[in-house]
Every structure is written in structure tokens, then in C-alpha cells.
From Swiss-Prot:
One GO process term, biological-process aspect: proteolysis
This protein's record includes keyword Transmembrane: yes
Origin organism lineage: Archaea, Methanobacteriati, Methanobacteriota, Methanomada group, Methanococci
GO MF, one example: ATP-dependent peptidase activity
Gene3D superfamilies: 3.30.230.10
Pfam families (UniProt xref): Lon_C
UniProt topology in membrane: Multi-pass membrane protein
TM segment ranges: 11-31, 103-123, 577-597
Protein name: Uncharacterized protein MJ1318
GO cellular component: plasma membrane
Similarity field: Belongs to the peptidase S16 family.
UniProt KW Glycoprotein keyword: no
Amino acid sequence: MKTWRENMKKILTLLLITFLLNSAFAVIIKAPAVSLTDRGYVGVPINIQINVTKGDGHVFMDTMPLTELDMQGSARIAAKVAGEVTGKDMSKYNVYITVRSDVPVVGGPSAGGTMTIGIICELMNWSLNKHVMMTGTINPDGSIGPVGGILEKIEAAKKANCTIMLIPKGQRYVEVEGNKVDAVEFGKKLGIKVIEVGSIYEAIPYFTNKKIIMKEYPENPLIEEKYKDIMKELSENVLKTANEKYENLSKELSNSYVGYEYQKALLNELTTSKSLLEKANDEYLKNKYYSATCSAFNALIKLETIEHTLKYLTGEEDVKTFLTEVQNKISHDKEIVYSKNVTTNNFEEILAGRIRIAEAEKLLDNAWKSYYLGNYDEAIKYGSFAKLRGDSAIWWVSLKENDNNGKIINEAKLKSLAQQYLDNAETILTYVETLFPNLPTDDLENDLESAKEAYKDGDYLLTIAESIDTCVKAEIPLVIFGDIEYSKKYARNKINLAENLGITPISALGYYEYANSLNDTISKIMYYKYSSYYAQMDIDVIKELNKSISENISSEINIVTNENVNIEETTTKENNVGIMISAIIGGLIGFAGGYLARRVSA
């Protein structure tokens, strides 16, 4: 009995020492929050303690009082971003986050940026400036997202004896009871300097007097040229097909009459397709080959729809026969796509083909639904798009058909990576759903379900692609009012890193080029997101197959310290992010998920 007691004492002593050591070396950081009282909403500071130990990639959270799920989602994303910023492989660490507040607080995602700073400081063993506080959500690309309660949180900073308050870029001006309040001036009256930051990189120097510079990689001119050669050939083929179809349909439509309303509608669509073709031809002449392909592809969708609408109206073809033919064609296209060997040189093209086949099948499902509801016009539109989406799958898997230098990949080796992408998609979607509970996310849930089904079927490339789709669409509300130049630079740098590893990131380069050609903000951000995700996917696949590359990438960060730190303060034009979000947020996911109302990539 005595021996047992002595052993227990030793174990308890070791546990106590471990706890004390962890507490001694923990990072403790304050964050502002909002609490609901009898007098309304008030700002309160909360304490966040962060410990990082060797582990296996878990994030643990202990909160008192209990917080909402959005804070837990923030914590996982914060750990992921901290790993990328510091060059640490977070699958080798566990993160423990303890949150304490004297009063119940409303929500929790606004501490995402703060938690990221805390985890970075723990990983790097850096001390914190206790007089700095920050509010802002953390986005997967490291940008800081908008929050509510800015003025109350500035008051919380005052209560915590802070002198600097960092807020998300674009939130300087806050509307209170119909009046605009300048948060910077509001802070001055409390003795607090309020500064806007757009990314975690901008926030780090204020807390640490150190600056982590995102390592910038140069473009690889040989790979850029290779990409252009591949895309030039594809754009020529698609342009030729689209131009010929336009000429044929122009003659056919001029010789047909299908009633005033239909004739007018079809002529309008023909005019739009002509504009798209002119844009495509212009982009081709400017060496923007992927953009030219996309513009021509969008023209083809309209022309295909005109062709089969005309056949239906003239009695040459019934809708059911058309959809059955499309269904058979997609089945044949799928056989071709899945018959290709996946190699280290073509895995991206095969992935692109598989996701396009999956999209073609979804479009065809919509076509059949429209048909059985008696909406034949919509059925023809979806059917035409489905047919062409199947065509584009074949285009992609044929891009490197003559490149036999790559090693065949055993797709089972990508199972772990596919699980990571699936987990990440689920985390981001849950995060967005808790941040924006009124946001319609049925399309995103369907994308996530498709990713899970692909994983169950052992189709790990498709799992990754469907997961990326979910992530990109889900992130739009998080970054829509962020710095678009940051998204652009982030994507370009990911592409350059892939190129420096000898990868030809065709999808990433294509999406980047396409984003540059677009005018509306939502589309640009969406395709920059696709670009950065696909470049990262290329890097991740190569790392998964060659672990030595992973070690080289992880160690590459640039740190500037002390007197060398030069903090540039920026401010934004007057706007009201909160009002703008509530005005358009409901339409964002519908835009991202909708097939017929947006321009699409080839």
C-alpha cells in the first residue's frame, strides 16, 4: 500500500510540475469581447492562455463561461494560419487554448486574429506587448476579417490598460443609430491609438516588435512559357469551335422564325455570345490564353443552348432525347477521364477532369429536374452546359497526353491528404455557418457531401477538388471586403512557390489569369482563391510524395527584428462593412454556387 501511495505521489508531482511548466511558458494574451448587460452591450477584456506542445495536430479548447462554436472553429483556423506564417508543420504540435472571462460574452470569432498571434508567439518563443489588443476574425489565407462591436471593443482595450487597438481594415467608420462614428477619433478620446490591419502579417509587429515577411518566390520563366504553350493550343481549339458554331447558328437563326418572344430572346443570346467571342479573340491576341478559353467557353454554352432550343422549337429534337444523348455522352467522357493513369506530371489535369465530370453530372441532374417540372427552357440550358462541361473534362485530361515522363501515383498515398482537405472544408463551412447563421448554404453542404462520398469511394483526387470547391465558396463572405491586392499577391506567391518546386501549376495559373481579366470583385476574389488553393494543392501533393521537400519549405521564413521593423499604417476610405455585409451577404453563396447566372471557367 505504501509503495502504491508513493508511486501516486510521484505521478501527481510530475503532473503538477508539468502543469506549472506549461503555465510558466504559456503565452497569455488579452482580447476584447462584448457582453450583454442590463445597460446594453459593453466591451470587456478576456484572457486567453495558449500552450503549444509536441503532438499530432490537435487543437484543444477550454472556455469559461462557455462560448459559441464559432470560437472553436476560429481556434483551428488560427492554428493552421500560425503554422503557415511560422513555417511550422502543425501536424507535429498540439495547441491548448484556455479562455477565461468574468462575464458571459457574445460570440467568439472576433478573437481569431488574437489567437493566431498568441499561437505564433508560442511557436516562436516570443514575448508579447501587453499594451496592444486586437479584434478581427482570422481567415484561412491570413487576412483579418470584419467583426461587430468595434466601439465597445475599444472600450474593452481601455479597461485592459492597452494603448493600441488593432481593428480590421475597412472598419474605421461605424454606424451608431444612423450616425457615422470614426473609430480612430473615438479611440483618441480614450487615449487609445486605433490602427487598421488587413492581415496577420501586418498585426505581428505591433505585438512583438518583430516582422515576419511572407517569403516571396520569383516566377519560373521556363514553366510560365510551358503553361502558355499548353494554353495557347487549347484556346485555339476552343476558339475555332466557338467561332464556327457562331457562324452556323447566325445563318440558321436568320432563316428561322420561332415566334416573337423566342426569336428576340435567342437573338439577344446570340449577340451576347458574339461579345464574348470578341473578348476571347482580343484576349488571345494579348497572350491571355486561359482567359480567352474561358470567354470562348462561356460563348459556347450560350451557342449550344441556342442550337438545342432552336431544334426543340422547330420540332427537330425533343428535350428528353437531347438529355438522354447528353447523359450517354457524359458516361462515355467519364470512362475516358477515369481510364487515365495518374502521374506526378499530370495529377492536376486528371483532378481537373474529374471535378468537371462531377460538375457535368450535377448539371445533368438539374436538367432532368427541370424537365420533369415541365421547365424545358431551363432543362435545355442545364443540358447544354452539362454537355460542354463533359467536353472540358476531356480537354483537361488531354493537355499532357504525350508527356510520359511522370511516375505513376498510387492514389492510396493521397488518402491522408484528402482527409486533411476534407477536414479543412468542414471546419471552414462550420465556421461560416456560425458567423452568418442566415446565410443559405445548401449548395455548400452538397459540395461537402460530394467530397465525403468521393472519399468513401476512394477517389481521393476528387475529394480534394470537391473540398477546395467548398472552401472557396465558403470563404467568399469572409474576404469579400478584404484587401483584394492581398488575395492577388497571396495567390501569385503560391504559384511561384509551386513553380520553384518544378511544378507546372496549370489550374492555378489559369485561375489567376482569369481573375485578372474579370471586373466584379466577387468573381475576382473567387478565382484568386481557386488559384491559391490549387497551387497549394500542387505543393501538398508533391510534399506528400516526397517528404524531404516538406522540410525544405517549412523552414523558409524571413524575420525582421527590433530597430529594423518599419510599420506602415494604412487607413481605408470611408465605408460601413457591417451594413454592406447585411445588404448582400445572402446573395454571395448563391452567386458562387449558381451555374447559369455567372461566368464560368473552362
